[in-house]
Amino acid sequence: MPASAPAFACFHLTPPNEGTAQTYWAFFQIMAATIRRTCPAAEIHLLTNTSSDVPDGLDCDQVFRHNTTRSQKECFERLMVEEVECWQAYFASDLFQEATVLIDVDLLVQKDPFDLFDGEFDIGLTYTDDPALHPFNSGVIFVDPSRPAVISRYFDRVVERVKSYGPEFQEWYGDQMAIAALLDDPDYSEASPAVIDQTKDDLNYRLWPTEQRNYSLPLDAENKPIFMVAAEPGVLHFKGARKGLMLRYAVEILGFDAVEDASVAGGWKISGPV
């Protein structure tokens, strides 16, 4: 049925390895618990494919399945193509009715983002001022529903770009490369903490620094994540090795309870303050 509420839409394919799959469903459940607390009026949409097994009891309101004839192994070998094609199909569906935030599975939502939607942008992105990284991180993308044809064209172009890349980038990073390419691969090394409004190809962008809307905990000299309180960012993104701190942060800092329970999706029962 069509969505009647703002939504968080999370793309995730079930990994072929059973242990890894369970771990990522645990991440999903932790992420969902933070959304239920900070954004109780929002829906949670899982974006996946027809080859993915979705566990019973997963905390989501809608499961959107993009049709595939490939094996799951083949899908993971072209994961970025699978992702952006799923985005493309989702935003062409009747589930896209209200303000929507595309999110990765490995993040915690600390603040309601929907007051950011003021009708003045079509796509909202988060940029980094670190020149060693891709200009944009695709873990948080804001999508306004006011101009659906513009949104559809945007994701068509993202798909076209990703499919033009070689196998390495079709498997990883191609989404971020395409997003940056559509803005001519900008350099924001001196831009932070500015919030930037920009128009290109009839599409209105709003760009937030990652430290405000898509923050990752710092790494030490040995590239190990540093556990620390980060209360200001709207979203905490536990990329890479930081994933090992996600449950700890939810429990110790955000006050959630987590109990191992093999009978629930992800193997952890997550509860806490509302």
Named regions from a protein language model:
Residues M1-C75, L95-F96, P145, A149, ...:
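N-terminal anchoring/stem segment of glycosyltransferases
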Residues A26-Q29, A33, V81, E85, ...:
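A structural signal for well-ordered alpha-helical segments within the folded catalytic domains
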Residues I35, W87, D106, I141, ...:
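A residue-level signal for conserved active-site and pocket-lining positions in enzyme catalytic cores
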Residues L47-V54, L107-F114, G240-A241:
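Short, polar loop motifs at secondary-structure junctions
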Residues S51-D59, F114-G119, L247-R248:
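Short loop/helix-cap segments at secondary-structure boundaries that form the rim of catalytic
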Residues G57-R78, N204-E222:
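Charged, often glycine-rich, active-site loop that binds/positions anionic groups
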Residues R65, L79-F136, V140-P145:
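GT-A fold catalytic core of metal-dependent nucleotide-sugar glycosyltransferases
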Residues A149-A258:
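Catalytic core and acceptor-binding pocket of nucleotide-sugar-dependent glycosyltransferases
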